[in-house]
A protein has these predicted regions:
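Bacterial Sec-dependent N-terminal signal peptides
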Residues: 1-44
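Short alpha-helical segments used as structural interaction elements across diverse proteins
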Residues: 22-26, 130, 254, 258
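Short S/T/G/P-rich N-terminal loop/turn motif that feeds into the first structured element of a domain
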Residues: 41-126, 134-272
């Protein structure tokens, strides 16, 4: 990958120096197409979401364990180049009177290097890590996971922590409408979200985990990032007049997808 980047930079310099040449202009056009393709390929990423529920009285112990042990293992995998990033989030909108706390782990992975990480022996002893894992399992009441493919959006730089809050909208979409739905989100709603100063990040993710023929399961997740909970309230509170064009745009997206559920999450830990 480093070799590819060096070649990429060298060609850019040569094209800049010779930009007045007609032949080089033609070559530049071809190269720009290559650059766009290269940039798109570099964005390909899987995001695995791991939902873990513990009793409310065990929530802080669970956070402490993640901070002391497992976040360091993920950081090691990131430094080794076998993982892109890892975040731990807390579900902020559970059911009323819920006696449990749900955490959501986001594993940012390279599709071509999926699950290709191990280690930890040089950080912790085998017995210490084994005990931490055992206690981790004892606290967990239930868990589940889903794998998603990042389709596009705008997010913080790879070496930056994400904003403090995220809203995950789980979308039900007919397989017949997958392509049109993706294009509508990426070409129409992505620019709108990017122009909204309250929204600090936005991403479209397609669920790639098998759904066991469940026609009521969500097919996509739209993630919207914010700096604070008041910013989320402010966004939800906005009621603006719509032009005929905007009404038609929203009617189109509403015909393509249905929101199954929404999760509001707050950031607990992050490793990059």
């Amino acid at each position: 990958m480093k070799f590819k980047i060096k070649v990429y930079n060298l060609i850019c310099i040569l094209l800049f120096i010779n930009h007045k040449s007609i032949k080089m202009k033609k070559l530049l056009n071809l190269f720009l197409v290559f650059c766009m393709s290269f940039s798109y390929a570099q964005q390909r990423m899987y995001v695995g979401l791991h939902y873990v529920t513990v009793k409310n009285q065990d929530a802080q112990a669970h956070i402490d364990s993640e901070k002391k042990y497992f976040s360091k293992l993920h950081k090691q995998a990131i430094d080794n180049g076998s993982k892109i990033g890892w975040d731990m989030w807390r579900l902020e909108n559970p059911r009323y009177g819920e006696p449990h706390t749900t955490f959501v782990y986001a594993h940012l992975e390279d599709p071509e290097d999926l699950y290709n990480y191990s280690g930890g022996d040089e950080i912790f002893s085998e017995s210490e890590l084994g005990m931490a894992r055992e206690r981790w399992g004892e606290r967990v009441v239930k868990s589940g996971s889903v794998m998603t493919s990042y389709k596009g959006g705008f997010v913080p730089a790879a070496n930056q922590d994400p904003p403090k809050f995220v809203v995950l909208d789980w979308m039900m979409v007919s397989p017949l409408d997958y392509y049109e739905y993706e294009q509508t989100e990426l070409k129409t709603f992505l620019p709108l979200q990017k122009a909204n100063k309250i929204v600090k990040g936005w991403g479209l993710h397609k669920i790639v985990s098998p759904r066991n023929n469940n026609t009521e399961a969500a097919s996509y997740i739209v993630a919207r990032f914010f700096d604070s909970m008041p910013d989320i309230y402010n966004m939800m509170d906005q009621t603006n007049p719509m032009s005929k064009t905007m009404k038609a745009t929203y009617k189109n997206i509403l015909s393509l997808r249905k929101i199954k559920r929404s999760h509001v999450l707050s950031l607990v830990l992050s490793e990059r």
